[in-house]
Curated annotation (Swiss-Prot):
GO terms for molecular function: DNA binding; DNA-binding transcription factor activity; nickel cation binding. GO terms for biological process: response to nickel cation. Belongs to the transcriptional regulatory CopG/NikR family. It comes from Rhodopseudomonas palustris (strain ATCC BAA-98 / CGA009). InterPro entries: Acetolactate_synth/TF_NikR_C, ACT-like_dom_sf, Arc_rbn_hlx_hlx, CopG, CopG/NikR_regulator, Ni_resp_reg_NikR, Nickel_NikR_proteobac, Ribbon_hlx_hlx. Ni(2+) binds at residues 76, 87, 89, 95. Gene3D superfamilies: ACT-like. Chain A, domain 2 (3.30.70.1150), Met repressor-like (1.10.1220.10). Its cofactor is Ni(2+). Binds 1 nickel ion per subunit. This is Putative nickel-responsive regulator. Pfam families: NikR_C (PF08753), RHH_1 (PF01402). Transcriptional regulator. Keywords: DNA-binding, Metal-binding, Nickel, Transcription, Transcription regulation.
Length: 148
């Protein structure tokens, strides 16, 4: 086992301590090891290739200079991946967006990484599910009745 020293800002330390208390960890090292494992698993899941559908969820401060314009440009640049977006005003400055994506897993991850890296984006997560690509010329001859 290796001993590592890290520096955390006060806000992040408070959040970490809250997780430790809520989950009953014996010490910070146990919590950080678990969080590192989760991050490693998530990174492995993000490296999935092939076609998938996904949900990109993020919050951002719309008052940050040029951020709404930059986000709009990114969405126009990746218009082939985005199917629908829901936008919610959380308060005077913070917004939440949920975007449904459809395409190659690597392209979806690249798009999400680009959005999440923008200054003013506070939180971001991409959830992907492997899916078959839509059939060319798919005709809609089946019912969507839940009772079928």
């Amino acid at each position: 086992m290796h001993r590592v020293t890290i520096t955390l800002d006060d806000d992040l330390m408070e959040k970490l301590d809250a997780i430790i208390a809520a989950r009953g960890y014996q010490n910070r090292s146990e919590a950080i090891r678990d969080l590192a494992r989760i991050g490693i698993q998530q990174t492995a899941a993000e490296t999935t290739s092939g076609h998938c559908v996904g949900a990109m969820v993020y919050t951002y401060d719309h008052s940050k200079r040029d951020l709404p314009r930059k986000l709009t440009q990114s969405f126009h640049h990746h218009h082939d991946l985005s199917r629908a977006t829901m936008h919610v005003h959380l308060d005077h400055d913070q917004c939440l967006e949920v975007t449904i994506l459809d395409g190659n897993a690597t392209e979806l991850q690249h798009f999400a990484d680009h959005i999440f890296a923008e200054r003013g984006v506070r939180y971001g997560r991409l959830v992907t599910i492997p899916a078959e690509p839509p059939a060319e010329g798919h005709e809609h001859h089946h019912e969507h009745d839940a009772s079928s």
